[in-house]
Amino acid sequence: MNLIAAAIAIGLSALGAGIGNGLIVSRTVEGVARQPEARGQLMGIMFIGIGLVEALPIIGVVIAFMSL
């Protein structure tokens, strides 16, 4: 039962991160299309956002392995 719970936790955290990263990148592309001169600033903010979104699945994996 613990293995199933760990697999579900890892899968859902990866799914959430994928959706979050897709939304962040799509909004950044829209912003660059509207204001090309703000590309550098938008890319920096995008990378910070992606880093924060990717931290959650890593924490989820660690918690899943700790529960085994």
UniProtKB/Swiss-Prot annotation:
Domain of life of the source: Bacteria
Key word Lyase present: no
Keywords assigned by UniProt, alphabetized: ATP synthesis, Cell membrane, CF(0), Hydrogen ion transport, Ion transport, Lipid-binding, Membrane, Transmembrane, Transmembrane helix, Transport
Subcellular location: Cell membrane
Transmembrane segments: 4-24, 45-65
Cystine bridges: none
Molecular function per GO: lipid binding; proton-transporting ATP synthase activity, rotational mechanism
Family designation: Belongs to the ATPase C chain family.
NCBIfam families referenced in this protein's UniProt entry, alphabetically: ATP_synt_c, PRK06876.1
Protein name in the entry: ATP synthase subunit c
Species assigned in the record: Staphylococcus saprophyticus subsp. saprophyticus (strain ATCC 15305 / DSM 20229 / NCIMB 8711 / NCTC 7292 / S-41)
